[in-house]
């Protein structure tokens, strides 16, 4: 069985924990888009591990970890991550494979990203400044440097020379920044070449072999669906496609080979950086939510904006991803709230709407229409049995399923992989506890 697991909001939904939990049954985990701008936080027996590029299956012995062609790969970031894992006694290089078609993220991408955000000032998009956008620009413009280029040093030198000259024109003459030296960039890549070279290969072919052997494969998304470059809250989005279709194009695996699509969603909503957020709470409730949820970016450390669950945006996410199941995370964050609110419609320019507008100026003006439910005000932290869940919490989950039309198959009640209620087994159709 082949399963896509992705975020349904603006990222930070807890995908890493769920992927890690499910990898006990899989042969491989694939990253198919994004870069090192988002981190997946895993907590195993109290020990925290943050992964940025390497798939979350790396913490499971014997699981093959694949970086697909849809990822933009920073060699220094990758090597740093490998070294961090090795220091914890986790071997990486024997189980990690990088698509030869994967584009590399290089110093001029980072320089451009930072220069652009600085120029925009208060109107900045709110990127992480790690060069993701410029790297994808080079890919689309067909001037990108790919992992396979590391195998041909002479050709690589010429490509680096041309690309650096091109980007230096912008850096020096438009942004008034110091130009970069192509030879330094090339020399740095040569240092990484010998370490990365054994891991470069044909990821699409590997996936095909696993499929023919009827092995289980997980395709792990980064960021969230509302950050999709085409279908998200543009222009306040990331530079890749974060929705389910990208699992195919970003890995070289045919779309008809996917069996399920699981959407990870918090029991509330968070967002980092600028952009519309209809249910955002700027009052004490929002601060309480952020504190209880420890809502700070795992890579950037930036505080996350918090708000109530948005049924309207979630329905859009279900539609664009063809979700077959939902994983509800961080339910325990709501334990102390006397009242829980669900946004069931928007009021835009005096009109009640049930679909999120793609026009961001209109979305900015939308106000949430709430349905109020009683809170449970008792701890759900660490629960593993649905029958032990407070009645009010079960009512909240049932109401979400009713409004969304998709089953909530897994509930996360804490950060550790053990803090989980499995209502429906992922790799078969057996219902273990419906409640």
Curated annotation (Swiss-Prot):
Keywords: Cytoplasm, GTP-binding, Ligase, Magnesium, Metal-binding, Nucleotide-binding, Purine biosynthesis. GO terms for biological process: 'de novo' AMP biosynthetic process; IMP metabolic process. Binds 1 Mg(2+) ion per subunit. IMP binds at residues 12-15, 37-40, 128, 142, 223, 238, 302. GO terms for molecular function: adenylosuccinate synthase activity; GTP binding; magnesium ion binding. Pfam families: Adenylsucc_synt. Gene3D superfamilies: Adenylosuccinate Synthetase, subunit A, domain 1 (3.40.440.10), Adenylosuccinate Synthetase, subunit A, domain 2 (1.10.300.10), Adenylosuccinate Synthetase, subunit A, domain 3 (3.90.170.10). It comes from the Bacteria. GTP binds at residues 11-17, 39-41, 304, 330-332, 412-414. PROSITE patterns: ADENYLOSUCCIN_SYN_1 (PS01266), ADENYLOSUCCIN_SYN_2 (PS00513). SMART domains: Adenylsucc_synt (SM00788). Pathway: Purine metabolism; AMP biosynthesis via de novo pathway; AMP from IMP: step 1/2. The keyword Cell cycle does not apply. It is found in: Cytoplasm. GO terms for cellular component: cytoplasm. Mg(2+) binds at residues 12, 39. Its EC number is 6.3.4.4. Coiled coil: none annotated. Its cofactor is Mg(2+). It catalyses: IMP + L-aspartate + GTP = N(6)-(1,2-dicarboxyethyl)-AMP + GDP + phosphate + 2 H(+). HAMAP family: Adenylosucc_synth. Plays an important role in the de novo pathway of purine nucleotide biosynthesis. Catalyzes the first committed step in the biosynthesis of AMP from IMP. Homodimer. Belongs to the adenylosuccinate synthetase family. This is Adenylosuccinate synthetase. It comes from Coxiella burnetii (strain Dugway 5J108-111). The gene is purA.
């Amino acid at each position: 069985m082949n399963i896509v697991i992705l975020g349904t909001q603006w990222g930070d939904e807890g995908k890493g924990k769920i992927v890690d939990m499910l990898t006990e049954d899989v042969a491989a985990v694939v990253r198919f888009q994004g870069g090192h701008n988002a981190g997946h936080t895993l907590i195993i027996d109290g020990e925290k591990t943050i992964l940025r590029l390497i798939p979350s299956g790396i913490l499971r012995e014997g699981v093959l970890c694949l970086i697909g062609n849809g990822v933009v790969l920073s060699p220094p970031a990758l090597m740093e991550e490998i070294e961090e894992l090795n220091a914890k006694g986790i071997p990486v290089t024997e189980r990690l494979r990088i698509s030869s078609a994967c584009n590399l993220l290089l110093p001029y991408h980072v320089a451009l990203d930072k220069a652009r955000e600085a120029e925009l000032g208060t109107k900045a998009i709110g990127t992480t400044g790690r060069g993701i956008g410029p790297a994808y620009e080079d890919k689309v413009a067909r001037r990108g440097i790919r992992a396979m280029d590391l195998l041909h040093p002479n050709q690589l030198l010429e490509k680096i020379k041309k690309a650096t000259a091109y980007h230096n024109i912008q850096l020096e003459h438009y942004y008034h920044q110091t130009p970069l030296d192509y030879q330094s960039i090339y020399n740095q890549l040569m240092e990484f070449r010998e370490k990365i070279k054994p891991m470069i290969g044909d990821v699409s072919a590997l996936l095909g072999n696993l499929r023919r052997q009827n092995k289980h494969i997980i395709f792990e998304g980064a960021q969230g669906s509302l950050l999709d470059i085409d279908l998200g809250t543009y222009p306040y989005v990331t530079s890749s496609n974060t929705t389910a279709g990208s699992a195919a194009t970003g890995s070289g695996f045919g779309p008809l080979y996917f069996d399920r699509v699981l959407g990870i969603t918090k029991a509330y909503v968070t967002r980092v950086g600028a952009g519309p957020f209809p249910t955002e709470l700027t009052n004490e409730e929002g601060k309480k939510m952020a504190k209880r949820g420890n809502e700070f970016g795992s890579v950037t450390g930036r505080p996350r904006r918090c708000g109530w669950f948005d049924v309207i945006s979630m329905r859009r996410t279900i539609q664009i991803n063809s979700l077959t199941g939902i994983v509800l995370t961080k339910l325990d964050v709501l334990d102390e709230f006397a009242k829980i609110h669900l946004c069931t419609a928007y009021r835009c320019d005096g009109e009640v709407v049930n679909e999120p507008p793609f026009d961001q100026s209109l979305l900015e003006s939308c106000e949430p229409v709430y349905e109020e439910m009683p809170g449970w005000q008792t701890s759900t932290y660490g629960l593993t049995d649905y029958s032990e869940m407070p009645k009010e919490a079960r009512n909240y989950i049932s109401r979400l399923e009713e409004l969304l039309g998709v089953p909530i198959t897994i509930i996360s009640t804490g950060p550790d992989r053990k803090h989980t209620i499995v209502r429906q087994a992922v790799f078969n159709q057996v219902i273990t506890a419906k409640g």
